[in-house]
Swiss-Prot record:
SUPFAM superfamilies linked: Nucleic acid-binding proteins
Assembly, per entry: Part of the 30S ribosomal subunit.
Family per similarity comment: Belongs to the universal ribosomal protein uS17 family.
Molecular function terms from GO: rRNA binding; structural constituent of ribosome
Keyword RNA-binding: yes
Top-level lineage group: Bacteria
Protein name: Small ribosomal subunit protein uS17
UniProt keywords, alphabetically: Ribonucleoprotein, Ribosomal protein, RNA-binding, rRNA-binding
Coiled-coil intervals, chain numbering: none
Xref: PROSITE patterns: RIBOSOMAL_S17 (PS00056)
Gene Ontology CC terms: cytosolic small ribosomal subunit
Function: One of the primary rRNA binding proteins, it binds specifically to the 5'-end of 16S ribosomal RNA.
């Protein structure tokens, strides 16, 4: 029997912290509609992501992908740095 891996989720966000070793905190903004008033609101979610070579810096725009649990709170990894901080 061959097991097939499902599609992994990807998100684009901005690095807000790089203080930890091999870990960065990525803030991902999503637009949601208020259920009653129908106004579009920005929601920010912070994900801890694995950064193997400590390449990311605060302000970098990165692509993160879901992965197996790497620690208590870390379930994402940095796939690519899309844009460097200025």
């Amino acid at each position: 029997m061959e097991q097939k891996r499902g599609m992994r989720k990807t998100r684009i966000g901005v690095v807000v912290s790089d203080k930890m070793d091999k870990t960065v905190v990525v803030a991902v903004e999503t637009l949601v509609q208020h259920p009653l008033y129908k106004k579009t609101i920005k929601r920010t979610t912070k994900f801890k992501a694995h950064d193997e070579n400590n390449e990311c810096r605060v302000g970098d725009k990165v692509l993160i992908m879901e992965t197996r649990p790497l620690s208590k709170e870390k379930r994402w990894r940095v796939v690519q740095i899309l844009e460097r901080a200025k």
